[in-house]
């Protein structure tokens, strides 16, 4: 794609939720869920059915989205710094999509949960509020109460719940930017549906008294074949602690209610684009920073490399494309977001690991043997894992030795077994595939070793992940 003339540059809207299970949207086949605006976006654009977050936890995933770098390259995650959370290096931030677009003349705005800090010589780092033309972001987890989010206080009276306030922020920025005719990039990171469970009371009746079918892999008996290491993180305990086992309908009703408010905000944003007369040149991307187990396999929360945790929604609406209401089945990942935005806005290829998804507008094309890493080096070391997705296969390696455990691996054929019910690691029928995947894994570890950021956490992990077992 050639460099675009300034007048041809599209507006970019990037919308990201927090902890959204792929089965929570109508366009992904969720029964009993009401998401008309997001489904409308899908109907007008392309739905990506095999999109993964390379690290299924918010801080690392958000840094990857912004930069196109894997976690072991950018080093941003909880507790991965020398004396606290890993801060993003200034050199990496300068190459993030918001900074590159601003340097290219885009008007930039951010609202919501930013998720990480930029290194500035202090222990805590800085949030980049001065790096955007308009800022509605916040540190930490932010709050569902708008008045508690300092940069969003002006919306508190009319929109007391934060989710709709972000819709209002987006609406106002879009309308103001459209007046000046300058291309813009608006990024909104919703807190929803992240815990604590505080849905907007305006929508209490949406799912009141409703029941929801459980996925076919729901419950502990469908996770017995998982590694013992996977049960050493807090995800296993949260199946009980968060009441998926005994109050599933109530828990999911509130979860879906949080997402319904996001859908309302998406509607506000799309209406603003249309009302401003810029719908023909405004690209919209919708995704989540990670998935959510919601009781599948007897787990709660996220982090682990299984489908419910690592595979997330991705919808791209590009008015320049003739493709509408189509689906892409190629394997894609959050490392591709920055490359896609920069390609769409500037017509420039990226030097990062990510790939532009513009070519996937032709959904009949296949992508070949691309390998998407799935990384977890957060939480207890017992639950550390490294895996990847390649074509229909997923390979996971659990390196921890001790407490009666030894290194183990899992292989799933996602085409035949999308619910990950059958570990094929000892299946002689896939012996050749196993050898191929093990070689791919070994190369992935070597790549980590060669390109890891110079921080002890990631250097140590390199040694840990060399295969010692099956």
What are these regions (language model features)?
Residues 1-408, 418-439, 443-446, 453-456, ...:
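Formylglycine-dependent sulfatase
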Residues 411-412:
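Short hydrophobic beta-strand that contains or immediately precedes a catalytic carboxylate
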Residues 415:
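Residues forming the ATP-binding cleft of Hanks-type serine/threonine protein kinase domains
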